[in-house]
């Protein structure tokens, strides 16, 4: 609990790298876990970025675990994307699992403060990192987090996995939603996630369409 982790970059190095990337039109994707790491990243971003709205690079912070309310406010002001992995909650955030073992029962409620972030207006982009890969698992734990105060609705979680990711990749004109003119990338589930959000992780994909072509059909004879 007393260990704050290992910083791979000091502030001056990080700020120099961020400035060089930003000035050359390169999108930043900064890995930061822990309040101290996030504080350093946010402070550097505040020094580097112009006023919000002047850039289309859509810089983002990866993971964002253990954000404080003040840090969330500052990220919102910078219009930086929060790239997060709600599947971590299902893997490590349940009672007795790694988060509680390392940080104690009082701290674990806000390790992944999805509700606070969504309410602040920050764009959420969800992904899997290295485990487990299935997005339905991540959607499930964003909606059914152990602490009600940090739960999202099914619509919010699905949007973060679809339009949120597309926006983070500057690809929302091509993918992320089912609209005329966009690529036909979609799935059909065996149940409606809006009717019973408590069973999302157990729902099965019946049909997968990629770029307009059926690539998986569970019941095809």
Question: Which residues does each PLM region occupy?
Answer:
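Acidic, glycine-rich active-site loops and adjacent beta-strand->loop/helix elements
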Residues: 65-67, 88
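Residue-level structural signal for beta-strand termini and adjacent loop
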Residues: 220-221
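Active-site-adjacent helix-turn-beta-strand microarchitecture at beta-sheet edges
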Residues: 1-22, 72
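His/Asp/Glu-enriched, well-ordered alpha-helical/loop segment
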Residues: 18-29, 36-59, 84-198, 203-211
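Short amphipathic alpha-helices and their capping/turn segments at secondary-structure boundaries
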Residues: 67-81
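Extended hydrophobic secondary-structure segments that form protein cores and membrane-embedded regions
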Residues: 59-65
């Amino acid at each position: 609990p007393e260990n704050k982790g290992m910083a791979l970059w000091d502030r001056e190095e990080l700020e120099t790298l961020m400035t060089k990337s930003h000035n050359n039109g390169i999108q930043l994707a900064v890995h930061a876990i822990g309040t101290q790491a996030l504080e350093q990243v946010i402070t550097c971003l505040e020094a580097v970025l112009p006023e919000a709205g002047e850039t289309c690079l859509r810089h983002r912070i990866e993971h964002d675990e253990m954000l404080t309310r003040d840090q969330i406010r500052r990220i919102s002001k910078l219009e930086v994307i929060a790239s997060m992995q709600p599947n971590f909650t299902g893997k490590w955030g349940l009672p007795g699992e790694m988060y509680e073992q390392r940080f104690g029962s009082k701290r674990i409620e806000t390790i992944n403060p999805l509700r606070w972030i969504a309410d602040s207006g920050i764009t959420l982009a969800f992904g899997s990192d290295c485990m487990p890969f299935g997005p339905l698992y991540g959607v499930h734990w964003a909606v059914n987090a152990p602490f009600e105060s940090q739960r999202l609705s099914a619509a919010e979680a699905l949007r973060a996995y679809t339009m949120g990711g597309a926006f983070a990749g500057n690809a929302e004109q091509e993918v992320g939603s089912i609209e005329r003119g966009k690529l036909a990338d979609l799935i059909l589930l065996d149940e409606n996630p809006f009717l019973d959000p408590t069973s999302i992780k157990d729902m099965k994909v019946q049909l997968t369409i990629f770029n307009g072509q059926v690539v998986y059909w569970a019941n095809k004879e």
